[in-house]
Curated annotation (Swiss-Prot):
Its EC number is 1.1.1.1. Homotetramer. Pfam families: ADH_Fe_C, Fe-ADH. It comes from Zymomonas mobilis subsp. mobilis (strain ATCC 10988 / DSM 424 / LMG 404 / NCIMB 8938 / NRRL B-806 / ZM1). SUPFAM superfamilies: Dehydroquinate synthase-like (SSF56796). The keyword Plastid does not apply. InterPro entries: ADH_Fe/GldA, ADH_Fe_C, ADH_Fe_CS, Alcohol_dehydrogenase_Fe. GO terms for molecular function: alcohol dehydrogenase (NAD+) activity; metal ion binding. This is Alcohol dehydrogenase 2. PROSITE patterns: ADH_IRON_1 (PS00913), ADH_IRON_2 (PS00060).
Length: 383
């Protein structure tokens, strides 16, 4: 087995009440001015003020950038960077789901390294650590609060740039399920399927290790048991807390084993059509699993067993098929669209989408490597 590196934030606060503990632990840190990166909904709902008030108790001032939209753009990064500089912010807090986290990571990275966001597309392109970042999570899916992945949309090229850089790993991650209760069903479903995709892709990645395998399988087990409950009753705290832990475990897995074609393809759909990332993953997942089954059927069966399927006595091929069907059934049960047509994607764009997907950093560790024609066919199979 080749050598491997395991990346994770220094401190990871989990469970009910962890937000207040994380802020209290900033006492004595020396930080004076925080930039809170979030979105308009979080600001209007009072959660941004809640965090700002907690910071005040520790003698820390804060400025707010709440212009983050789903699929954060280069423009958003530049807007946030200006506020950071204008307020002499010495650290960054991201508050929300994957979009605020990714935007904050890019802001923190460019703040210390200079240049443009696109300079850091790819793997470990930066030379200096980013500004310290605390990521406070409000969704159970992307795990961006604890990863070295940062996805930013280049609105000029209409592509999502995958920045995979150890320097954007947050200093502290916070997963307080009390902040997740307000997630609507659709967002709960999309982010939950994103987490399940992380587990599948990390477990079948060419860079998987025994550590990432353990994280991925436990994540898949917890998601299968709790996602539908969390969708049906968002106030079910045991389900919310389980999903918070599950998505974190899936994040530990893919942060260190990387991903595959589902994410490489979903990034293009999100960048080109501005579609929600988790939904794109959910629609593509069974199709990519079927494509990969010819080389990792046994691994797909393993995930199915972890999800609670009675397939231990089946052969690898049959077990993989049953697992893929279970993924389809779960997605349908929580209201995920059936295909890319429902999302508004167009078949005539597939050649361009496939070309960009093959250049995405996430494609490198897919267990079955395809060419332009095969990836085009994969896209088309999802229409």
């Amino acid at each position: 087995m080749a050598s491997s590196t395991f990346y994770i934030p220094f401190v990871n606060e989990m469970g009910e009440g962890s937000l207040e503990k994380a802020i209290k632990d900033l006492n004595g840190s020396g930080f004076k001015n925080a930039l809170i990166v979030s979105d308009a909904f979080m600001n209007k709902s009072g959660v941004v003020k809640q965090v700002a008030d907690l910071l005040k108790t520790q003698g820390i001032n804060s400025a707010v950038y709440d212009g983050v939209m789903p699929n954060p753009t280069v423009t958003a990064v530049l807007e946030g960077l200006k506020i950071l500089k204008d307020n002499n912010s010495d650290f960054v807090i991201s508050l929300g789901g994957g979009s605020p986290h990714d935007c904050a990571k890019a802001i923190a990275l460019v703040a210390t390294n200079g240049g443009e966001v696109k300079d850091y597309e790819g793997i470990d392109k930066s030379k200096k650590p980013a500004l310290p970042l605390m990521s406070i999570n409000t969704t159970a899916g992307t795990a961006s609060e604890m990863t070295r992945f940062c996805i930013i949309t280049d609105e000029v090229r209409h592509v999502k740039m995958a920045i995979v850089d150890r320097h954007v790993t947050p200093m502290v991650s916070v997963n307080d399920p009390l902040l997740m209760v307000g997630m609507p069903k659709g967002l709960t479903a999309a982010t939950g399927m994103d987490a399940l995709t992380h587990a599948f892709e990390a477990y079948s990645s060419t860079a998987a290790t025994p550590i990432t395998d353990a994280c991925a399988l436990k994540a898949a087990s917890m998601i299968a048991k709790n996602l539908k409950t969390a969708c049906d009753n968002g106030k079910d705290m045991p389900a919310r807390e389980a999903m918070a832990y599950a998505q974190f475990l899936a994040g530990m897995a893919f942060n260190n084993a990387s991903l595959g074609y589902v994410h490489a393809m979903a990034h293009q759909l999100g960048g080109y059509y501005n579609l929600p990332h988790g939904v794109c993953n959910a629609v593509l997942l069974p199709h990519v699993l079927a494509y990969n089954a010819s080389v990792v059927a046994g691994r797909l069966k393993d995930v199915g067993v972890a999800m609670g399927l009675d397939i231990a006595n089946l052969g690898d091929k049959e077990g993989a098929e049953a697992t893929i069907q279970a993924v389809r059934d779960l997605a349908a049960s929580i209201g995920i669209p059936a295909n890319l047509t429902e999302l508004g994607a167009k078949k005539e764009d597939v050649p361009l989408l496939a070309d960009h997907a093959l250049k995405d950093a996430c494609a490198l560790t897919n267990p079955r490597q395809g060419d332009q024609k095969e990836v085009e066919e994969l896209f088309l199979s999802a229409f």
